[in-house]
Amino acid sequence: MSGRMISRRSVLALAACTALGAVGCSKTEEYNGPELILRYAENQPEDYPTTQAALAFADLVAERTEGRVKVVVYSGGELGAEQSVIEQMQYGGIDFARVSLSQLAEYQPALSVLQLPFLYTDAPQMWRVLDGEIGDEFLSGLGAMDLVGLSWFDAGVRSFYTREKVETLANLAGLTLRVQESDMMSEMILDLGAEPAQVVYSRVYAALHNAEIDGAENNWLSYEAMGHYEVAPYFLKDEHARVPELQLASEAAMEKLAELDERFPDIIRTCGKESALAERRLWAEREASAEKHMREWGVEVTILSTAEKARFRAAVEPMYAAFEEQSRLIQRIREA
């Protein structure tokens, strides 16, 4: 658990005052700590960009509410897996969290469109979409789940890495590539001419080493952190997926904040947006550092030509047919 916890003496003093009533407590025993303590769930370790942003959020909330509200960040999955966290938030058991888009899309299918491959040309376009009207529409839609969308976090851009060099779409034909547990990701691999394999993340290194799979896909940070470069030293920088993550509040938490002070919900929203900007900066720094380190180690990086990238885009275009009802939304995204 991260964050500075309330002292045991203060807790005991508060408990005593609650049990005996304010009249029974002297001024020296009055509880002077936060009036509201809220829990924030994060499944990444403390040094990860999203967790660092959660800690920044907690500090901002404490500062802007003048110490009246304290957010305690529980990192490393201490409060449960993401699916469990989402469910707990819906009934107010957890107050804040950072969750992946794929998990939320299980409950809010409209979000699935943001997982389509090659949806954006580059990162600036994605942030124009998410920080603009379209992103706000998606955040507002979370109200149907009793959740409040605060901001969008960066989760990097995903590319392929393989045991043998891949330079073109044709080179992917027949390869077995590990993907996340996602029907959409599996369909993408099939459309690209390869075979999808759903391997537990912790086993990907061994599967690559033992030639059970020919490659996998992920972002630079994960590629470096998991040591996959040692057994798959060829990185195809195709950037097929830019899938953001979300920082959320429970509606129950926002109601408690409003009861304490009507200004606090807006303060929380502002802190969410500011912490998201900090997360994006930190992610960009870590991503650049990881890529630099991998290149120095000897990873061979292939960047697709404009013509070759167009072939990749064309290959997955059939996936968009399943989103015919959202064709206007997709057009708005591509024109952003």
List PLM regions with ranges.
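N-terminal secretory/targeting leader peptides
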Residues: 2-6, 12-124, 134, 142-336
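A gly/proline- and charged-residue-enriched helix-loop-helix capping module
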Residues: 126-130
